């Protein structure tokens, strides 16, 4: 049985931990609102950009050369996985769920005889994936010092991908991130970004609006596709940021409540132990008095 001193130390330790988890929960809640607004504001822009590109691709002049970012290399040998996770932990299953989706995808590709390369955006994804795919990880992009994600962060990732694509380092690139739905619901998502997966414009959209393009559609597509890549990456980073704070807020709330339950149980054990010791001392005193 633990001594009273051990029990007091244990209770004090849990109380200190509870203060930390409560503080982290409050910080995550404060960051969540800003991150959620940024993610929700980015969605319509990214969706509209994809719609514009779909319209352009549908109306591409017959015989015109399709940009490589849309047509691809024509091969399916080398796959690049861009895995976006957090720089820190203590956010539940947020990091592990994204890494698991990427890991399963990589395993399928390897089983099919494809070559897999991985770029990790965020330290936690790198820590998880390097256990199995150390040789496949070609780069780690850390965002530890970034206080607020912006267009320049997405542009840096885009430039990296475009340089590798032009150098012929991969054929297909897939982006992995967590789509934010609510504080308790984040959905790990895989999105092919090179070549771009663009839905063609619907027949009604083509009928309702007839556009004349200057310059031609192919030139506009070639100019917009790199920007669309940046927009999709920025959206993924913002969705990830909101998902991370939501997961951390939920995890720290659960940890705080669990700490409270543990404090109650340990306090009960402490009181029972103390009561047993007092009772034992009284019995010893009474027994000694009777012996006299």
Swiss-Prot record:
The keyword Iron does not apply. One of its GO terms (cellular component) is plasma membrane. GO terms for molecular function: ATP binding; proton-transporting ATP synthase activity, rotational mechanism. The keyword Transmembrane helix does not apply. Pfam families: ATP-synt. InterPro entries: ATP_synth_F1_ATPase_gsu, ATP_synth_F1_gsu, ATP_synth_F1_gsu_CS. It comes from the Bacteria. GO terms for biological process: proton motive force-driven plasma membrane ATP synthesis. It is a peripheral membrane protein. Its main location: membrane. It is found in: Cell inner membrane. Keywords: ATP synthesis, Cell inner membrane, Cell membrane, CF(1), Hydrogen ion transport, Ion transport, Membrane, Transport. Belongs to the ATPase gamma chain family. Produces ATP from ADP in the presence of a proton gradient across the membrane. The gamma chain is believed to be important in regulating ATPase activity and the flow of protons through the CF(0) complex. PANTHER family: ATP SYNTHASE GAMMA CHAIN, ATP SYNTHASE SUBUNIT GAMMA, MITOCHONDRIAL. F-type ATPases have 2 components, CF(1) - the catalytic core - and CF(0) - the membrane proton channel. CF(1) has five subunits: alpha(3), beta(3), gamma(1), delta(1), epsilon(1). CF(0) has three main subunits: a, b and c. HAMAP family: ATP_synth_gamma_bact. This is ATP synthase gamma chain. It comes from Methylobacterium nodulans (strain LMG 21967 / CNCM I-2342 / ORS 2060).
């Amino acid at each position: 049985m633990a001594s009273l001193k051990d029990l007091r130390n244990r209770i004090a330790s849990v109380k200190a931990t509870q203060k930390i988890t409560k503080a982290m929960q409050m910080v995550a809640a404060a960051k969540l609102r800003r991150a959620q607004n940024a993610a929700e504001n980015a969605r319509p822009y990214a969706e509209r950009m994809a719609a514009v590109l779909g319209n352009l691709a549908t109306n591409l002049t017959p015989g015109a050369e399709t940009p490589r970012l849309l047509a691809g290399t024509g091969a399916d040998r080398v796959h690049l996985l861009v895995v976006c996770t957090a720089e820190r932990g203590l956010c539940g299953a947020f990091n592990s769920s994204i890494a698991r989706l990427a890991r399963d995808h990589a395993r399928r590709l390897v089983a099919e005889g494809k070559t897999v390369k991985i770029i990790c955006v965020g330290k936690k994804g790198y820590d998880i994936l390097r256990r199995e795919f150390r040789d496949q990880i070609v780069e780690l992009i850390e965002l530890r010092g970034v206080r607020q994600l912006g267009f320049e962060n997405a542009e840096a990732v885009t430039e990296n991908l475009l340089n590798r694509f032009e150098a012929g380092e991969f054929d297909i690139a897939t982006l992995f991130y967590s789509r934010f739905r609510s504080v308790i619901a984040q959905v790990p998502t895989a999105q092919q970004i090179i070549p771009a997966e663009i839905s063609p414009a619907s027949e009604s959209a083509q009928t309702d609006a007839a556009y004349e393009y200057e310059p031609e559609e192919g030139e506009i597509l070639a100019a917009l596709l790199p920007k669309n890549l940046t927009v999709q990456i920025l959206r993924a980073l913002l969705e990830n940021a909101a998902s991370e704070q939501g997961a951390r807020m939920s995890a720290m709330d659960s940890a705080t409540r669990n700490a409270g339950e543990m404090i109650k149980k340990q306090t009960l054990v402490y009181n029972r132990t103390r009561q047993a010791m007092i009772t034992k001392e009284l019995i010893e005193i009474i027994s000694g008095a009777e012996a006299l």
